[in-house]
Amino acid sequence: RQMCIRDSSEHVYTRDPKREMSLIYYANRSGLEDRVFRLRTGKAASAKPMPRTLHLINNVRIAEQADGTLEVKLNWHTLFYRLATSEQFYGPATYHLKPDGDSWLITRKHALLLNDTINSVLDFYHL
């Protein structure tokens, strides 16, 4: 049975964004790339004027996996100011990283928004 907001617990998080409510979800990378393009070119009405943000990362925990990749768990906190309104968003996140020469590539990112009662459209720069 599909979970409805009215009968779900605020302590049970979305596991399947295709079937349950997810505040930000792109089926593939091209959707996210399109959103970034619209923001960079000024074609996204929701981002005029662009917000001022401050992103804080803490409690970083790194675990090397058997295949040489890394699983990185952390907590994040974003402070957001736009149109005379200040807001904050926060939660835990998990990254999967794979080595790429002298650097690392993000192969998966899962950010959980803990204060999910929002007053406006949520976008990726909030996370």
Predicted regions and their residues:
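Short beta-strand edge/turn micro-motifs at domain boundaries
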Residues: E71-K73, L83, Y90-L122
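Charged, gly/pro-rich active-site loop segments
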Residues: L56, H77-T85, A93
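Short, small-residue-biased leader/transition segments that mark boundaries at the very start
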Residues: R1-I5
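Short hydrophobic/aromatic patches at helix-to-coil boundaries
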Residues: D123-L127
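A solvent-exposed, acidic/Ser-Thr-rich amphipathic alpha-helical stretch
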Residues: R6-K73
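A generic structural motif
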Residues: A63-Q65, L79-Y81, K98
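A broadly conserved detector of short glycine/acidic/proline-rich loop/turn motifs that flank catalytic sites
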Residues: A66, W76, H110
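Short Gly/Pro-enriched turn/cap motifs at secondary-structure boundaries
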Residues: P51-R52, T85-E87
